[in-house]
From Swiss-Prot:
<keyword id="KW-0620">Polyamine biosynthesis</keyword>
<dbReference type="GO" id="GO:0030424">
    <property type="term" value="C:axon"/>
</dbReference>
<dbReference type="GO" id="GO:0005802">
    <property type="term" value="C:trans-Golgi network"/>
</dbReference>
<dbReference type="GO" id="GO:0030425">
    <property type="term" value="C:dendrite"/>
</dbReference>
<dbReference type="GO" id="GO:0004586">
    <property type="term" value="F:ornithine decarboxylase activity"/>
</dbReference>
<feature type="active site" description="Proton donor; shared with dimeric partner">
    <location>
        <position position="357"/>
    </location>
</feature>
<dbReference type="InterPro" id="IPR009006">
    <property type="entry name" value="Ala_racemase/Decarboxylase_C"/>
</dbReference>
<keyword id="KW-0333">Golgi apparatus</keyword>
<dbReference type="GO" id="GO:0033387">
    <property type="term" value="P:putrescine biosynthetic process from arginine, via ornithine"/>
</dbReference>
<dbReference type="GO" id="GO:0005737">
    <property type="term" value="C:cytoplasm"/>
</dbReference>
<dbReference type="GO" id="GO:0005634">
    <property type="term" value="C:nucleus"/>
</dbReference>
<dbReference type="GO" id="GO:0005801">
    <property type="term" value="C:cis-Golgi network"/>
</dbReference>
<dbReference type="GO" id="GO:0043204">
    <property type="term" value="C:perikaryon"/>
</dbReference>
<keyword id="KW-0663">Pyridoxal phosphate</keyword>
<dbReference type="InterPro" id="IPR022653">
    <property type="entry name" value="De-COase2_pyr-phos_BS"/>
</dbReference>
<dbReference type="InterPro" id="IPR022643">
    <property type="entry name" value="De-COase2_C"/>
</dbReference>
<keyword id="KW-0539">Nucleus</keyword>
Length: 456
């Protein structure tokens, strides 16, 4: 084992474990106290399962986890143990990853517009791979980080994505030749091309077009004497099963596009920047009802079967905390009752509100719930992406803590996977059986296509 994560970092649980089981234990424990604070349960086994699924679906692609999506220490540690790289966007994210013990060669500073002091920090700490999309960035890097290995980020069609990024980042194709020429004149090393089709992309064809465009930029670069060897296909992969498009569908489009434009014989190494893919479904959140208010309504004759009141519930996490995903990530979290109601309990039109003094701190509007009481719990699933990472301490409310769990079989799979990664350095093709009865495939093959140490 690499030693990035230890058994003391999580609760080791038996097979058949569900996040709900650990939540139940914690709820029972904290309900004996006055502090019934909101909390997360993170199933690291789900992260491991996603990693195996990624390697199977995109065998030529090395994942560089997008730290901005969820910077929880447990997530960073388990992905470091699994051999993933890391997509960092700031000095703070680089510090976080390197504090865990990750080598700088496994980090790409994937922010095309960086503060000069942070470029110098990357240089001082050995982080060489970084992205750019404009002339000013090239000038800054040439002065502040002469050993940088630059990756040209190109614009894409992200019109079918929930969070469009090309409005802010990415050079249009018509500008790429000029940027490459300038890089050559400044003696800046350009090693490859990157793109991002947007977060929450629902159009897999966007990847095909972007990969095709990247091939054109590779050809432009050769005109200036560059021999590019890296393609970064970004992220945007779905992280929950209820997404409009499945991850395997996207992979089914990416793989033939890579084979067409960047065949294995080209010796181009492929990386990606999955974020929500890894963590969205791994995190569940429990919140406690801290206050309630009934609102009476007049009822007409034709509405006599409807309730005459609605109820406002106030819970101890909100939009300024973990539910910032409503604002920044177009999320629509749905509450799950902790206590199963009786069939004859009436439902009331209800709204859920966070704990802060801001009237905008509303989690849900017009949801049908049985009557709840102060001290009751509500659960929310699929809360791992862009929740913790953007939460604040507004009004003095603290971020909800995370309790990590790892199924024993998943931990065994991590150990088997780690042995395979170590053997990769010694043999070109190794097939490590995954015989714990838990994994998604009968075997996991490791090839020299992208070993953990192959970016140097």
């Amino acid at each position: 084992m690499q030693g990035y994560i230890q058994e003391s970092d999580f609760n080791l649980v038996e097979e058949g474990f569900l996040a709900r089981d650990l939540m139940e234990e914690i709820i029972n424990e904290v309900s004996q106290t006055e502090d019934r604070d909101a909390f997360f349960v993170a199933d690291l086994g789900d992260v491991v399962r996603k990693h195996l699924r990624f390697l199977k679906a995109l065998p030529r692609v090395k994942p560089f986890y997008a730290v901005k999506c969820n910077s929880s220490k447990g997530v960073v540690k388990i992905l470091a143990e699994l051999g993933a790289g890391f997509d960092c966007a700031s000095k703070t994210e680089i510090e976080l990853v390197q504090d865990v013990g990750v080598a700088p060669e496994r980090i790409i500073y994937a922010n095309p517009c960086k503060q000069i002091s942070q470029i110098k920090y990357a240089a001082k700490n050995g982080v060489q791979m970084m992205t750019f999309d404009n002339e000013v960035e090239l000038s800054k890097v040439s002065r502040s980080h002469p050993n940088a290995r630059m990756v040209l980020r190109i614009a894409t069609d992200d019109s079918k994505s929930s969070a469009r990024l090309s409005v802010k980042f990415g050079a249009p194709l018509k500008s790429c030749r000029r940027l490459l020429e300038m890089a050559k004149n400044l003696s800046v090393d350009v090693i490859g091309v990157s793109f991002h089709v947007g977060s929450g992309c629902t159009d897999s064809k966007a990847y095909t077009q972007a990969i095709s465009d990247a091939r054109l930029v590779f050809e432009m670069a050769s005109e200036f004497g560059y021999k590019m060897w890296l393609l970064d296909i970004g992220g945007g992969f779905p992280g929950t099963e209820d997404s409009k498009i499945r991850f395997e569908e996207i992979a089914g489009v990416i793989n033939p596009a890579l084979d067409m434009y960047f065949p294995e014989s080209s010796d181009v190494q492929i990386i990606a920047e999955p974020g929500r893919y890894y963590v969205a479904s791994a995190f569940s959140l429990a919140v406690n009802v801290i206050a309630k208010k009934e609102v009476e309504h007049s009822v007409s004759d034709d509405e006599e079967n409807e309730s005459s009141k609605s109820i406002m519930y106030y819970v101890n996490d909100g939009v300024y905390g973990s539910f910032n995903c409503l604002v920044f990530d177009h999320a629509h979290p749905k509450p799950i009752l902790h206590k199963k109601p009786s069939p004859d309990q009436p439902l009331y039109t209800s709204s859920l509100w966070g704990p802060t003094c801001d009237g905008l701190d509303q989690i849900a509007e017009r949801v049908q719930l049985p009557e709840l009481h102060v001290g009751d719990w509500l659960l929310f699933e699929n809360m791992g992406a862009y929740t913790i990472a953007a939460s604040s301490n507004f009004n003095g409310f603290q971020q909800s803590p995370v309790h990590y769990a790892m199924p024993r079989a998943a931990w065994k799979a991590v150990q088997l996977l780690q042995r395979g990664l170590q053997q990769t350095e010694e043999k070109e093709n190794v097939c490590t059986p995954m015989s714990c009865g838990w994994e998604i495939s009968d075997s996991l093959c490791f090839t020299r296509t992208f070993a953990a140490t192959s970016i140097i």
